[in-house]
Amino acid sequence: RDAYLLTMQMWHEETVTIIEQGKQAGEFTFTANATDIAWRLIALVCGLDGMYVLGIPEMADPAFKYHLDRMITLELFA
């Protein structure tokens, strides 16, 4: 459990860094908090991954990519 928590925190920190660097470079146009955006993106990936592993047909590769791309667009280019 501790290793999982550490990995999740590291993933979050790296995602926040990427989001903030993208905003500073003018690549992203969001107004929300980068920390919150990172948690929402991670939560989406974890949820989609669970559905994918369960073999839910609606979550095959194309759908997984579509939903992730859609959320990234909504979060980072708002």
Segments (PLM) and residue ranges:
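Short secondary-structure transition hinges
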Residues: 1-16
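C-terminal peripheral helix-coil segments that are non-catalytic and often amphipathic
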Residues: 12-25, 35, 42-44, 50, ...
